Amino acid sequence: MLVLGIESSCDETGVALVDTSASPTPCLLAHALYSQIAMHQPYGGVVPELASRDHIRRVLPLTQDVMKSAQHTLADVDVIAYTRGPGLAGALLVGAGVACSLAAALGKPAMGVHHLEGHLLSPFLSADPPEFPFVALLVSGGHTQLMRVDRVGSYELLGETIDDAAGEAFDKSAKLMGMPYPGGPHLARLALGGDGAAFKLPRPLLHSGNLDFSFAGLKTAVLTQAKKLGTELESRKADLAASTQAAIVEVLVKKTLAALSQTALKRLVVAGGVGANALLRSQLNAACQQRGIRVHYPELEFCTDNGAMIAMAAGMRLQAGLVNLDALRGSYTFDVKPRWNLSEFQSEPALATQNA
């Protein structure tokens, strides 16, 4: 069975094709991605209206590229999957509308996919996929969560941020230091030349006794320190960047280790854009190696939003028998969910026609 996946939740347009006849997980046949970073950079962040319009321009040409690369036609596709949420409402509607229109024209079923489930299952796109069960650290621009994953569709929330996500802490701190959008990668690069112990920054909720996160206070501390430095900020920017990164990473690592200890699981999956951070990977790898825990990451190209993870999540749900294809056929109305907690999703079938 061929599954076409479309991602349009924020500022990347992604399309991919997977084959679910492969075992034990679907095989990625082709994928294409277009990033809107350059378009949003002058504004210092994502402009939702511009994002939606650009998705409209890109999604069909990318689909054509994917089908050509995979040496298939749209008529060969069995299921069309799209990101139903969470994300920007207008951007989500573009992907959902295109997916359901194509499905209706081809007489094929369309299914909505949870964006975070896509991130969670993205390591299955690698040559060394994880095995269930595992603890997952989901760290992106908008989400920071620790979850226990027993199988596809079975997710237990262990802890999450109560305010800013880790990715927001990176991006907002970078912006306070005068770095361009998106700030996180710029901050990480600058931190390579700095001293992570130069500034004493808070580690919010580090000793809270639970697995929740908080990064809003850290952002405030960075702002205070930047103002205190004044004209010296430019010469001390690398140190402040390194200290900020060290604070974020320490909290992520220690909370993750606590989750592994609490669940007694020996496998860890790290997914989402922040999962590409070199310091985070280095510290997690070292700590987990000492404890006999295997760590799995997506390939770097699949850390940020992409169509491959959406196609993979849909394909794995189909393989697990969690999707009622008969209920999808012949009805192409749809809705999107800009706010949608993965723990609410659980083993709910991803039906394009389901009500919110």
From Swiss-Prot:
> What role does it play?
Required for the formation of a threonylcarbamoyl group on adenosine at position 37 (t(6)A37) in tRNAs that read codons beginning with adenine. Is involved in the transfer of the threonylcarbamoyl moiety of threonylcarbamoyl-AMP (TC-AMP) to the N6 group of A37, together with TsaE and TsaB. TsaD likely plays a direct catalytic role in this reaction.
Q: Where does Fe cation bind?
A: H115, H119, D305
Tree of life domain: Bacteria
Q: Which UniProt keywords apply?
A: Acyltransferase, Cytoplasm, Iron, Metal-binding, Transferase, tRNA processing
GO terms in the biological process aspect are:
tRNA threonylcarbamoyladenosine modification
| HAMAP family attached to this UniProt entry | TsaD (MF_01445)
The UniProt catalytic activity note for this protein reads: L-threonylcarbamoyladenylate + adenosine(37) in tRNA = N(6)-L-threonylcarbamoyladenosine(37) in tRNA + AMP + H(+)
Q: State the EC number(s).
A: 2.3.1.234
Q: Which residues form the signal peptide?
A: none
Q: Which family does it belong to?
A: Belongs to the KAE1 / TsaD family.
- Cellular localization per UniProt: Cytoplasm
* Co-factor binding comment: Binds 1 Fe(2+) ion per subunit.
Ligand binding (substrate) = L138, V139, S140, G141, G142, D171, G184, N277
Q: What class of enzyme is it?
A: transferase
The protein, known as: tRNA N6-adenosine threonylcarbamoyltransferase
* Gene that encodes it: tsaD
* Keyword Cytoplasm appears in the UniProt entry: yes
Cofactor requirements of the protein: Fe(2+)
Q: Which GO terms describe its cellular component?
A: cytoplasm
| A single GO molecular function term of this UniProt record | N(6)-L-threonylcarbamoyladenine synthase activity
